[in-house]
Amino acid sequence: MMNRVAVLDVVGLTRGLIGEFTPRIAAFVEAGQVSSFKPAFPAVTCTAQSSYLTGLPEEQHGIVANGWYDREAAEVKFWKQSNHIVKGEKIWEKLRKVNPDFTCAKLFWWYNMYSSADWTITPRPAYPASGRKVFDVYSHPMEMKEEIKSELGDFPFTSFWGPKAGIGASQWIAGSAKWVERENQPTLSLVYLPHLDYCLQQYGPDLSDARVNVELGKIDALVGELLDFYAERDVEVMLLSEYGISAVDQPVHLNRLFREKGWITIKDELGLEMLDCGASKVFAVADHQVAHVYINDASLMEEVRELLENTSGVDEVRAPEGYSAERAGDMVVVSNPNAWFTYYYWLDDALAPDFARCVDIHRKVGYDPVELFLDPELKFPKLAIAKFLLKKKLGFRALLEVIPLDASLVKGSHGRDNVPVDEQPILVTQGSVKYDVISRPEEVADRIMQRVLGR
């Protein structure tokens, strides 16, 4: 007989944030067993989740960041969806071998397409030939998304990422988890709640900031709602997070440094600048506080290392040993605790590519947290958005250029693995069985399986 378990992945939750403004979470932690542990490296969503769900370190599951440079295609690829990208046996596959009746629902965790989990749902826009982007989700079974949308409405994509990101996306995901539980009663439910990821990057992890406290209260209320829901259905809940957010005030522009050295190749496209990775001698794929540096000209290896080691804001330059060789950079760079890496490569904002001022997570050669902000220099941002939406409704192609190019706006980041305990991810379990404190992200998989198996 297996226990039914729901794992709530509350992104950004740490010991340092639990307290006055999170009474439901605080009570759950007080009544259970909590482990703070060294995060995955890099401490980003795709790497952390892959370690949790395979029990393997990065060099074995292969997820070196949220995106990386594909050397064969000579393209940077971020936020891909196929579960086949993650190497290794997943925990639901292991548990199914123990008991063929075991089932798993994977709700908005990443790499959620073509997974062997029983029920999955993930954000997946449609891209018609007209060039439009139509917000939608993907599910397995395929018909499930329409059934869920008929009850919850369309997924609020703009609250999942961008300047309007907020609690709405996490509420919809929680609603989909309830729907799947009522309809299917999975043995294991994996539920992704990203809300804190937004405000903590916008404002920093500052508990003296009333805006942060308000957002903590929102996620606490939602977690409390799920705790009550699952308790009524005799489902054990585990609380989990992926990383903590560190306060930052120093953006570091590695690709601009490389460009000044003459190592970056720029392609002119309609008067704007595009980074040509395949033709560049050296370039960086930035992901929060970690960057993979790819060196196409091996003769520059030592010169690149010396430049990086003497760059303000850089804490470490690591060798790629221990990382997935075909995906990782030739060097892996870690920022100082107060710094983070941009993808910026242009030296004149007037020549920035057209997607730079848009929410465009796939074209940018790195992660861009500035997408969480509206450009403060826009006099009438709501009017710009209204014009865009009108054009979109009429079937015209248009760019929603409302994102600033000011990296100093970002106040929180993550990615480092050497962080204080109060900024480490946590795992909270309930029940009478007392476990050893976990110390590594790979151990999360065993702990989840132990709870399902009642061990």
Predicted regions and their residues:
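Short, structured active-site-proximal loop/turn typified by the sulfatase FGly-forming signature C/S-X-P-X-R
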Residues: G16-Q60, T103-A105
